[in-house]
Swiss-Prot record:
E.C. numbers: 6.1.1.14
Enzyme class: ligase
UniProt source species: Buchnera aphidicola subsp. Acyrthosiphon pisum (strain Tuc7)
Subunit relationships: Tetramer of two alpha and two beta subunits.
Name under which the protein is recorded: Glycine--tRNA ligase beta subunit
The encoding gene: glyS
């Protein structure tokens, strides 16, 4: 077995920073799939990525000449020869298909009979000719939504590919990938893009890049170096860096030869609101702000350069100038905004379109005001404060700061509201209205914030359904699924007793749609929410069967649904709960056989067997015991009580003949079973649990 090191490096133009990790991981996984498909063994694979290269290093790849055994069974011997001993047409066709004569065929005999059989060994394609094909296939199968095309051949990838290296130990593997011939010249740093780095042996990768031009090809090593460097620099000025994994990942994907540099800015800029300052440094400039021990910003930031140079001072001065300009703009926008109060911007929203056919942001604000007023009755939040928050909710969208930094919407509204001496809960709600922003994000903390978030999201959902912008199976351009999950989470996790049906109807009514399409829209929205609810519970870890058993009962109160799902999950874990479920199944099967509806009241006088009387008494006792439990939605207690039916049901089926010769007695017993089924199905459709 011959084993060698295989190196593949794909030199590209600058890859998108936000996609670099995804692209490199897909390349790695796709390549492994290709190796497995071709039965090529190896010890391990390591992948590398920088903004201008994707690479794989495969250790101990087996390049031994390989053979595959081919077996082909032909027609049976009986069908292969005629009565005179000559080959039949079926046998002749099979021999021709195999490319052999009858002397090369053998006979395969077993207990079922005897057939013509052909067995041979075929040499597989040489691994050296396979690798370029495998590489191109692995790259082409990377799932990228947006790609670029280049060259006369109209090649397609995330960014144009400019260089290919395929090296097996010291040997260059000849072949083309994206019509680029492989060689042993690695793509150099962007500052030296006209020159290349010659690599003689695959084992030298990625060390040779570091030695020649300080390029760190390993994404994870590069990331750790950046973290270590910025922390050390911050310590030197008695500061620290707050963890920001998103920024770290982005910067790591932007550079391949990182060098951390300390840069200062004028202290006057510390008067700018902290969130504006941080946003400018982190989001706009991709730099790291530094904090003191009291978690206050220091007049410094750290910039990650993409080049190792002796002229660091020039880079520092350049970044100082750029940051000064950015912070000056932010300072100007902030001061300009504070010339007027936040509330005075309300009428300006009339000039801002919310969505085609849905009016302006001012009209949306008025709808939110009416909806939050209605929600406040259920959330126990202050009605006047809720209305105030609604009226201010979109005012920051026409401020200079938010126009320049859209990601600060809500945050700036809260800050300006506090400056205007608005109540703290009202101001906080302006930021909280956008929560949760993504899966697993935090929820609003204030009751007003919860109400405002629900009202805003529900108004958007209703509006989009109203104009037909409904998500399809693969497209959701307005992130309506996320909005629905946000509403669901707030109602459930904050225990707000909102009826989803009433909420949707109230929201739709604010669009003044009063015709036969009302019901169609409502049904579409309910279905949309129920699908989202199902998926959310499934992702949370609940059994799909349990979720379906509860949702199929058409309950629209989310808190009620939640309690039922929790209770059924609890019940399923109880000892012997399965026997009750099987009893319910038996009852359902008996009732399903009846062609006519089973209607009427149970007549105790028609009960002649002790076991049916005991079962009836148990039902009456259960109804009395659980009457208040149902009102209080104590489903755990109800299900525990349901377990008390286990023996009475068992004895009933054992001793009582349901299909009695007397039709009245038979009907009475079926009514008894029907009553039992209704008890169980008040909580969930147990047929999903069988």
């Amino acid at each position: 077995m011959t084993k060698k090191i295989l190196l593949i490096e794909i030199g590209t133009e600058e890859l998108p920073a936000r996609l670099l990790s995804k692209i490199s991981l897909y390349f790695y996984k796709n390549f492994i799939k290709e190796l497995d498909f071709h039965n090529i063994s190896y010890k391990n694979i390591k992948y590398f990525s920088t903004p201008r290269r994707l690479a794989l290093k495969i250790k101990d790849i087996d390049i031994t000449e390989r053979f595959v055994e081919i077996k082909k069974r032909g027609p049976s011997i009986i069908n292969s020869y005629d009565k005179d001993g000559f080959l039949t047409e079926a046998a002749t066709r099979w021999l021709k298909h195999c490319g052999i004569n009858i002397n090369q065929a053998i006979r395969l005999k077993n207990e079922k009979g005897e057939w013509l059989f052909y067995k041979t060994r075929k040499k597989q394609e040489n691994i050296e000719s396979l690798i370029p094909k495998i590489t191109e296939s692995a790259l082409k199968n990377i799932s990228i939504k947006k790609s670029m095309r280049w060259g006369q051949d109209n090649q397609k990838f995330s960014r144009p590919i400019r260089n290919i290296v395929i090296l097996l130990d010291k040997k260059v593997i000849p072949g083309d990938v994206f019509n680029i011939t492989s060689k042993n010249l690695l793509q150099n740093h962007l500052s030296l893009k006209d020159s290349q780095i010659k690599i003689k042996d695959a084992k030298d990768y990625p060390k040779i890049l570091l030695e020649k031009n300080n390029i760190i090809a390993d994404y994870f090593i590069r990331k750790e170096k950046i973290i270590e460097d910025i922390e050390n620099i911050a310590k030197k000025i008695k500061g620290f860096i707050k963890k920001n994994n998103v920024l770290i990942e982005e910067v790591t994907a932007l550079v391949e030869s990182p060098k951390a540099l300390l840069v200062n800015f004028q202290e006057k800029f510390l008067q700018i609101p902290k969130k504006i300052l941080i946003n400018t440094i982190e989001k706009k400039q991709k730099c790291f702000p530094i904090y003191n021990s009291e978690k206050k910003l220091l007049p410094y930031f750290i910039f990650i350069s993409n080049i190792q140079t002796q002229e660091s001072e020039k880079i520092i001065i350049g970044n100082q100038r750029v940051m000064h300009a950015r912070l000056s703009d932010a300072e100007f926008f902030f001061k300009n905004d504070r010339k007027v109060k936040l509330e005075s911007r309300l009428l300006s929203l009339k000039k801002v379109l919310f969505q085609n056919n849905l009016g302006s942001l001012y009209e949306k604000t008025l709808r939110i005001k009416l909806l939050i007023k209605w929600i406040a009755k259920y959330s126990s939040s202050d009605v006047e404060d809720s209305i105030r928050a609604a009226l201010l909710s979109k005012c920051d969208l026409v401020t200079d700061v938010v126009c320049e930094f859209p990601e600060l919407q809500g945050k700036i509204g809260m800050y300006y509201a506090l400056e205007d001496k608005e109540k703290k809960d009202v101001a906080t709600a302006l930021e909280e209205q956008y929560l949760p922003r993504f899966s697993g994000d935090k929820l609003p903390c204030t009751l007003i914030g919860c109400g405002l978030s629900i009202a805003d999201k529900m108004d958007t959902l209703s509006g989009m359904f109203y104009i037909g912008n409904i998500p399809s199976s693969d497209k959701d351009p307005f992130a309506l699924r996320r909005l629905a999950i946000g509403i669901i989470r707030i109602i459930l996790e904050k225990n707000i007793p909102l009826n989803l049906e009433d909420l949707i109807k109230k929201s739709l009514s604010l669009y003044n749609k009063k015709n036969e399409e009302d019901l169609i829209l409502f049904d579409k929205m309910i279905k949309f929410f129920m699908i989202r609810l199902f998926h959310w519970y499934e992702e949370t870890g609940y059994s799909a069967k349990i979720i379906k058993s509860v949702l199929s009962c058409k309950s629209i109160e989310l808190i009620d649904i939640h309690k039922k799902i929790q209770a059924i999950s609890f019940f399923k874990k109880l000892k012997d709960s399965q026997s009750i479920i099987l009893s319910i199944k038996r009852i359902s099967n008996i009732l399903a056989k009846e062609k006519e509806k089973i209607n009427g009241d149970i007549n105790k006088k028609l009960m002649i067997e002790k076991e049916e009387i005991i079962l009836f008494n148990n039902i009456e006792e259960f109804d009395n015991y659980t009457k208040n439990l149902f009102l209080e939605k104590k489903y755990n207690d109800i299900l525990i009580k349901i377990k008390s039916f286990e023996n009475p049901i068992y004895n009933f089926f054992k001793k009582v003949k349901i299909y009695h010769s007397d039709s009245k007695i038979r009907l009475n017993r079926l009514l008894l079973l029907s009553k039992l089924k209704k008890i169980f199905f008040k909580i969930a459709d147990f047929s999903y649990l069988y």
